[in-house]
Amino acid sequence: MDDIRKVIKRNSPPAVVLQTLRTALQMPPAAARNIVKDLTRPLGDQKRFIRKFDNEHWKGTLIMSEMIRCDDTIAIQRLKKADIVIFEVHGGGFRVGHSTMYMESFVSWLRLIKSKYNMYACIMSIDYGLAPKHKYPGPLNDCVKAFDYLTNGLGVSPSKIVLSGDSAGGALVLETLIETYAPSILYDLSAPRENFDQPLPAAALLSSPLVSGVIESESWKQFHKTDVVSLGLAKLIYKEYLNLPETKVENLPIMRLHHVNNNFDRFLPKNVMVFIGDKEVLRDDVVNMVNAIKKEGRTNLLFIKENYAHDWFMIHELVKKKDKHLIAKYDEMFVDFCVDAIKEARSQTDTTTTLKSIHELSEYTTIHINQSIKLPVTEIDKNSTQSLDEHFDLFEKIDFPIPAKHKSNTILSEYAIFTDNSSKKSVLI
């Protein structure tokens, strides 16, 4: 069955895929979800990367090599020890989609990060509540809670986190950042950043992000009949997710998102990568946001635009065969972007920690000119002195019970599973 699905995914004309998605997204919720789920269900070999979670902290999936062999405790340990953590929020018009719908992209990123940089990455992909059962701001609260659990609950430093969101997921990523760092912005556009207890994340990836609730731009007029996103879907989002007209527009902070046009560093990471299609309805709104960010000059912005429809970077089937090389090209570009951003963020964190230690020393310590000064090394300092390219012991010493039927790993050539006959256990390296 997987082979059949692979053939369909690889050989379906982009125009057919686009029309199928466009139609499915406007169907009643149950039918729409079933179609999208079937089109995006992980293939057999991709399932080895998946570990599902559903607890009081968050719901979603941890995606990393051989997660299928991990229990919850080990999976969380691997997340915490990873060099890069990608906090992923899927799209789907707030009414369809799931945390493993882009496994082709996810596996590509993980493999590239390991093969090119010898670094380990883990993707924390969120399953938020879907409309119409879960209306705004419920799904946003799910994302904010999950991000808080990642950073404060698990203690993962934002300096090694890259947020990623496409379409509706892009809106949720932006709102999650605002709610976490500057929650008053959507009520008062001049409101300052409030949360300085933790640094901003290292980077953000936004693929065809929804950045405006208004459908009056020129690109909306030009492409609403041919894009994946239609006026019909927009009306469903208004009704099912935003609960219009029962809810007043002034009571919906998300409807003011497009008014944020300056001081983006109150909530945006230093490094931002944006993809957009030249044939999509959201194009003009995204371009306006990108131009505003560029004008300020405080953000390292990488902006990619290709002559395709909505969310082409994540939905590979929308790209013509002759242009498939673009996916590989931009996957590698995204990986390079992630690694550079993580290195920059970690370097800044090291500097901040050092300056803080010196400041505290100057306030509380008497220094004699001939005295050698030795500062206590905190746990954070220990972690920060670790090379980005070092192997973590955790990845080399994880013990797993031997499965009933032992199979060699064929998913990633850079990982191997060896059986330790003396201890009767398997070791993942």
Model-inferred region functions:
Residues 141, 153-162, 175-365, 415, ...:
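Alpha/beta hydrolase fold serine-hydrolase catalytic domain that processes acyl esters and thioesters
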